[in-house]
Curated annotation (Swiss-Prot):
This is Endoplasmic reticulum resident protein 44. Mediates thiol-dependent retention in the early secretory pathway, forming mixed disulfides with substrate proteins through its conserved CRFS motif. Inhibits the calcium channel activity of ITPR1. May have a role in the control of oxidative protein folding in the endoplasmic reticulum. Required to retain ERO1A and ERO1B in the endoplasmic reticulum. Residues 1-29 form the signal peptide. Disulfide bonds join 189-241, 301-318. Residues 377-387 have a biased composition (Polar residues). Forms mixed disulfides with both ERO1A and ERO1B and cargo folding intermediates; the interactions with ERO1A and ERO1B result in their retention in the endoplasmic reticulum. Directly interacts with ITPR1 in a pH-, redox state- and calcium-dependent manner, but not with ITPR2 or ITPR3. The strength of this interaction inversely correlates with calcium concentration. CDD domains: PDI_a_ERp44, PDI_b'_ERp44, PDI_b_ERp44. The gene is Erp44. A motif (Prevents secretion from ER) lies at residues 403-406. The keyword Calcium does not apply. GO terms for molecular function: protein disulfide isomerase activity. SUPFAM superfamilies: Thioredoxin-like. It comes from the Eukaryota. Residues 236-285 are annotated as: Interaction with ITPR1.
Length: 406
């Protein structure tokens, strides 16, 4: 007969505590540390990856670390598959090559990746566990709204840019490419889809993708490229979803200033769509070749009264065109002059050549004075940049230019 085994009360309590702890303690998600050896493999295999670019000496980075780790734990419980969502980090001092690759100019910087592709918009929201978790949940939500009736297409919000895909089957390569593009561009366009018999009237030549631009009178545009070619499909839809002339708001101002390009801005009243259309047409006609050297923007006069005051204007003066070089602001002449061929283009060229800055300080160039006309001393000090105040704040980030100056 086996001898009886007796446990003391203290031993029994200890055993129960260990058992309960093993059952109810959540598994801590590991933050992937990225380096030049593993970064491509980890990011390429992740549906969604949020990467924290940091430096140990940066106090904002230090404050973010425990928040980032806790948010990772929360999300890991909801998306347990390791490739569904990845939280990762890069020590930019140890891996300066990676920091340069992704043009990191401030710490911490939180960038989102989808299947290895870096999204243009980085995370700039609140640094809290809830905000980060909500952001990831939003990124994991379905980017395409499946319509149940073609009446939904008739009643679309035409103030938005809408991309509609008509497919025979949801389980198809055509739709998978469409959905992947939508996951990247859903902040810029509304994506909708229809399948089977519901979509049949719009599939007279097979699966079909249509762009409906803002405005009831604007004609639809049909995608004619390969439905299974991601790059071609993405480029076509991006061209439609990201306009040449973008609206600047207080929400996206930081993002736009960080692109580092001067602003050519039309200030207009919100309901003045005519001036906006004229400006858009002239930018497309005169300045398409300058797309990589300057940002074309429009702004609500009422919301951006302060920049207008900087150039001695008020909403009553709108529409007004100006350039903000992040050092100074320069005003275009009469808005009607934008219709003069080459006038707007010359204004931008004068910025790049330094003529605008030079003339503000020293008066008109000698070549601009008519023969026999006496030079007038009209030198002045141009208004300081107003939109540079929307740039990343030193109260949220360590800006690398500031550290370089130390």
């Amino acid at each position: 007969m086996n001898p009886a085994v007796f446990l003391s009360l203290a031993d029994l309590r200890c055993s129960l505590l260990l058992l309960v702890t093993s059952i109810f303690t959540p598994i801590t998600a590991e933050i992937a540390s990225l380096d030049s050896e593993n970064i491509d493999e980890i990011l390429n295999n992740a549906d969604v990856a949020l990467v924290n670019f940091y430096a140990d000496w940066c106090r904002f980075s230090q404050m973010l670390h425990p928040i980032f780790e806790e948010a990772s734990d929360v999300i890991k419980e909801e998306y347990p598959d390791k490739n569904q969502v990845v939280f990762a980090r890069v020590d930019c001092d140890q891996h300066s090559d990676i920091a340069q690759r992704y043009r990191i100019s401030k710490y911490p910087t939180l960038k989102l990746f989808r299947n290895g592709m870096m999204m243009k918009r980085e995370y700039r929201g609140q640094r809290s566990v809830k905000a980060l978790a909500d952001y990831i949940r939003q990124q994991k939500s379905n980017p395409v709204h499946e319509i149940q009736s073609l009446d939904e297409v008739t009643n679309l919000d035409r103030s938005k840019r809408n991309i509609i895909g008509y497919f025979e089957q949801k389980d198809s390569e055509n739709y998978r490419v469409f959905e992947r593009v939508a996951s990247i561009l859903h902040d810029d366009c509304a994506f909708l889809s229809a399948f089977g018999d519901l979509s049949k009237p719009e599939r007279y030549n097979g699966d079909n993708v249509i762009y409906k631009p803002p405005g009831r009178s604007a004609p639809d545009m049909v995608y004619l490229g390969s439905m299974t070619n991601f790059d071609v499909t993405y480029n076509w839809i991006q061209d439609k979803c990201v306009p040449l002339v973008r609206e600047i708001t207080f929400e996206n101002g930081e993002e736009l200033t960080e692109e580092g390009l001067p602003f050519l801005i039309l200030f207009h009243m919100k309901d003045d769509t005519e001036s906006l259309e004229i400006f858009q047409n002239e930018v497309a006609r005169q300045l398409i070749s300058e797309k990589g050297t300057i940002n074309f923007l429009h702004a609500d006069c009422d919301k951006f009264r302060h920049p207008l005051l900087h150039i001695q204007k008020t909403p009553a003066d709108c529409p007004v065109i100006a350039i903000d070089s992040f050092r100074h602001m320069y005003v275009f002449g009469d808005f009607k002059d934008v219709l003069i061929p080459g006038k707007l283009k010359q204004f931008v060229f004068d910025l790049h050549s330094g003529k605008l800055h030079r003339e503000f300080h020293h008066g008109p160039d000698p070549t601009d004075t008519a023969p026999g006309e006496q030079d007038q001393d009209v030198a002045s000090s141009p208004p300081e940049s107003s939109f540079q105040k929307l740039a990343p704040s030193e109260y949220r980030y360590t800006l690398l230019r500031d550290r370089d100056e130390l």
